[in-house]
Amino acid sequence: MFHDYTQGAGLLRYELLPGEPVDEFTLEILRQNTPEGVLLLGRESGEEGDFLLLPVAGLIPLLSEDNSVINKFTKDKLMEEVKTIQASLRDHMIPPDELVLRPEWTWLDPETGKPVLPVLPTPLARDLSLSMDAYELLVAAICEKNRQTAEENTTAKQAGARASAKRRGPAKPWRRVVRDFWENLD
């Protein structure tokens, strides 16, 4: 089951049951974390138990040079993602006791390096009323929306650059500028 949070950027610790192998069933349960498959960031074994470290669904953490995990989203983007996931989960009427709210979760703001403390709902994978396929579709939809937004922003910037170039008119070659300057000195 999803047992606890890990200090860092949106990490989940998935607790393996005693003797539970990391087999196809387990990976299928975990596949909801990313539409492309399971992204394992590591494995911890100790007195507390055996854990797989995973990213939060829809939030893709990046490892920095010093091995601390920094989320790729800026603070505003991150909160937008959190609200989207929360709203989508509410739409599927998951009972509140199946959500774990952890205000201690910390993200590091890539711009300032300071921690950001959102409250993100974490579905308990094996006790979830929402089916795994439906949750995977939800995560895929969030990723697709992100991609479309990025494409729209790129298109808008390109259109703005073209309009600006039209206002300026065609650029003069520098030789012609120099020739015009000398010819017009009189």
Residue ranges and their predicted role:
Residues 55-64, 95, 102, 148-150, ...:
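Short, solvent-exposed coil/turn linker segments
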Residues 74, 78-81, 86-124:
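Catalytic-loop of the protein kinase fold
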Residues 29-34, 82-94, 139-146, 178:
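Hydrophobic, Leu/Ile/Phe/Ala-enriched alpha-helical segments that form helix-helix packing faces
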Residues 109-186:
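C-lobe/activation-segment region of protein kinase-like
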Residues 2-79:
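Conserved structural core of kinase catalytic domains
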Residues 1-10, 14, 19, 73, ...:
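Gram-positive cell-envelope targeting signals
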